[in-house]
Amino acid sequence: MKFLTSILILLNSFLIISQENWTNLIGDDLSNWEIKQGTAEFEINDGVITGTSLLKSPSTYLGTKEFYSDFILEFEVFVEAGLNSGVQFRSLNYPDQKKSVYGYQIELEANNPERNRMWTGGIYDQSRRSIFLYPLSVNPIARSAFKVDEWNFIRLEAIGNSVRTWVNGIQCSNLIDDTSKNGFIALQIHSIGKESLQGKKVKWKNIRVLTKNLNQNRYPVEDYAPEINNIDNYLTDKQIEEGWKFIFDGISSNGWIS
């Protein structure tokens, strides 16, 4: 009985320490954030950050003043139907350009008739390669995870060259990419081209980030979320376990005969 009690005390202590290591990114005001690129407005009320879509404005970002490299990010988000949004991470600014924000983005895509992709949780490379690095076409199970006009729980793990996402507990992305290693986190209000979308809103709450003890806090990888490796001349642990190996080292002709 004493042994069981000791175990429970240790587990409770670990949970308390784990909770204490998280940093809440939403305060009483937006003093730790800054507007980037566009002119859409953000406001904070009762712990909820709300961004309002604005016609004739480029995409607008509310970015953290602090930069983050390796971290776990969790938040809840509510996207009104018809809007496209996202959260930038490890992102930077191009100097003296209108489309200044670039870097990785977690897609937040409310279902609309023109797109009908439902790729929320996928990884897009904003204003750089300008492609989906992890499209949910490779992970169809994840396409139904996001709920439009409801609060959704999002989790991002950006640790080393590994980027993984979850939407409402469903793993969406499992990406290996090393293009960006550090940068700000930013909430996006995407540009709109229709008056019917004017004034629609995206809301975020309970945004928190973990920068310590990351490996101990990682979620397990699901088999239905295939790994995509974008790094040249690099094999992941999973690929090595599957038996992949290089037949050309990228430098010499070792192992080849003429």
What residues fall within each predicted segment?
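Bacterial Sec-dependent N-terminal signal peptides
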Residues: 1-20
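Carbohydrate-interacting regions of secretory-pathway proteins
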Residues: 19-258
